[in-house]
Amino acid sequence: MKRGLWMVLFAGVTGCDSIMASEVEQELWNALEIRNYQFTYTVSCFCGFVGPNPALITVQNGAVTRVEYLRGLGGQGSYLTQGYPTVDSLFAIIDRVQARDPADLDVDFDDTYHFPRTIAVDYAKNAVDDEVTYTASGFKLLASPQ
């Protein structure tokens, strides 16, 4: 308990862009034990991301079970779930980005559920089109599947 309180206080002093803040937010998310939810996932980049974007992601029992296209650009229905994140996967994205030592990493966390709402990355300060932003919005809790 003391460790958790110390981490929250430390995160408040150092700001949410620190590694410690990400770890605190992940611990708070894990403590909620949320396994069933939906959210809208958007990737903004010049990286050739293929697939529904934005996509409505449904997670049941901690696994992506459905991905739906949200814009009418010819795509409809549901898609393969492989490659689309859960909230736990969003925290893993933060870990992978931090391991690459980017020029800038800005993460904004949800105040209620503590998931990463926005992960904005600039890998190289003076490079063009290397930035990527991952966004999770419209988070909604779902009932447990039968």
PLM feature spans:
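Sec-dependent bacterial lipoprotein signal peptides
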Residues: 1-14
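Short, surface-exposed binding/anchoring microloops in extracellular/periplasmic proteins
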Residues: 43-62, 66-69
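Short, surface-exposed coil-to-beta transition loops
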Residues: 49-54, 127-133
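A short-motif feature that recognizes glycine-rich, charge-decorated loops
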Residues: 63-103
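Short, structured surface segments that line ligand/substrate-binding pockets
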Residues: 94-127
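Short, low-complexity, Pro/Ser/Thr/Gly-rich segments in the mature regions of secreted, periplasmic
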Residues: 133-146
